[in-house]
Each structure stands twice: as C-alpha cells, then as structure tokens.
C-alpha cells in the first residue's frame, strides 16, 4: 500500500459511466476522467511556520471532488491511484 507524505492524500478515482444517458457506449478514449474519488490514505498534515502541525480535513473513506488536472497518477498492481496535495481537494461529498 502507498502511504502519502506530509500534506498529501491518495485518491482512488471514481470510474466514469460506460454509457451516456441516451445509451451510447463510450470507449476508453472517449471517456473524460472523473474528478471525484475516494480517499484511501491521508498524510500526517502540514507544519506551520511556528512548528504547529495541522492535520488534513479529510479522512480515509471520504468521497471528494478535486481539481481536474491535479496530482500524479501511480499504478500499484491493477489499480491506479492519484496522489495530490490536500489544497487540490475542492469538497467532501456528503450524501
């Protein structure tokens, strides 16, 4: 498993739908990458100038929305994860 350092999180990106609302089946090249995902690991947080540590606002299992072109993709086995800074998270999805 990957363990993020500092103020980073690891996201498992939500899969895009295979078909459109009108029933058209999309190929992998036609699908846009989703900017939603599940937090699978959280780093220890950031350190302020005064030495105080601030923990990230998200936790493992949170569904989040992140900036479209943020982060770096990393493959582990058959899964692809996205490592990004907490600042690149835009919202937590609450249902």
Swiss-Prot record:
Tell me the GO molecular function terms.
ATP binding; metal ion binding; protein folding chaperone; protein-folding chaperone binding; unfolded protein binding
In terms of SMART domains, this protein maps to: Cpn10
Q: Which InterPro entries does the UniProt record give?
A: Chaperonin_GroES, Chaperonin_GroES_sf, Chaprnonin_Cpn10_CS, GroES-like_sf
Keywords (A to Z) from UniProt? Chaperone, Cytoplasm
* Region forming the signal peptide: none
Q: Which Gene3D superfamilies match?
A: GroES chaperonin
Primary site of residence: cytoplasm
Please name the CDD domains in this protein's record: cpn10
Cellular localization per UniProt: Cytoplasm
GO BP annotation list: chaperone cofactor-dependent protein refolding
The answer to keyword DNA-binding applying to this record is no
Q: Which GO terms describe its cellular component?
A: cytoplasm
Q: Does the keyword Aminoacyl-tRNA synthetase apply?
A: no
HAMAP family in the cross-refs? CH10 (MF_00580)
Subunit structure as annotated in this protein's UniProt entry: Heptamer of 7 subunits arranged in a ring. Interacts with the chaperonin GroEL.
- Free-text function comment from the UniProt entry: Together with the chaperonin GroEL, plays an essential role in assisting protein folding. The GroEL-GroES system forms a nano-cage that allows encapsulation of the non-native substrate proteins and provides a physical environment optimized to promote and accelerate protein folding. GroES binds to the apical surface of the GroEL ring, thereby capping the opening of the GroEL channel.
According to its UniProt record, which protein family does this protein belong to?
A: Belongs to the GroES chaperonin family.
- Please state what the protein is called: Co-chaperonin GroES
Q: Which organism is it from?
A: Staphylococcus haemolyticus (strain JCSC1435)
- Name of the gene: groES
